[in-house]
């Protein structure tokens, strides 16, 4: 099964960007892979370089990554409309990248009317598979994992987990907190990443596999990669590293965690202290 990452391979480092990083030079900001947000909902969303639900800087962002030898992924931000309609909107807008870039669903609480509906990401993934022949990877915050749990075996979807130990500024980490705890293929461990060539903050990720594994997710027919062995999730540690509550409070005020109940989920055990 491809859906669960191996315990030890040549892991890769990368960042994910969206309409908030318009103009970033993906050729020079260091990474093994770059993931680009391409579509939101089924249109009608604007902001940054986002026009009618499409990231107008995505082609340039992806070209810089490809031309500098990086692997790529493209994601769709779920807004919770009809899942098949959103899947088609995504596929229609990333046709040139299918079987070259990993296809991803961004499943999170903010601006998502279907948050909490376990069937929505499954229907979206099935439609993407029907249209492209590719099983997408599913991104969600650790507190939302229950909604997508089982998609690894049901639909052969890799899982990408977001969970932050602290909000301190950091570069790439070799062993992020809790990595592998969900048997995930990829882990996003900060939204306060700092890399040379970009003055803003970035989401940083570790992919638990090598380039051949990445390409196998992008193109299941790729003969260059063997299927990955499956691993059992490790039990979750009971204590998190020290959390910077002031930074969490600042991000809460800024709206990073949305509103209750999503905010309560995102902040987890720090909810009372931050609020």
For each feature predicted by the language model, list its residue ranges.
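Conserved, mostly hydrophobic/aromatic
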Residues: 29, 65, 105, 128, ...
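N-terminal carbohydrate-binding/catalytic regions of secreted carbohydrate-active enzymes
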Residues: 8-77
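Solvent-exposed loop/turn segments at secondary-structure junctions
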Residues: 19-23, 38-44, 77-83, 108-113, ...
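Repeat-associated, polar segments at repeat-unit boundaries in modular proteins
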Residues: 268-275
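Extracytoplasmic Gram-positive cell-surface binding/anchoring modules and repeats
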Residues: 251-264
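Functionally critical loop-and-helix segments that line ligand-binding/catalytic clefts
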Residues: 6-28, 32, 152-240
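Active-site groove signature of glycoside hydrolases
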Residues: 92-120, 124, 138
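Structural recognition of the beta-strand scaffold that forms the well-ordered cores
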Residues: 13-16, 32-37, 71-76, 101-107, ...
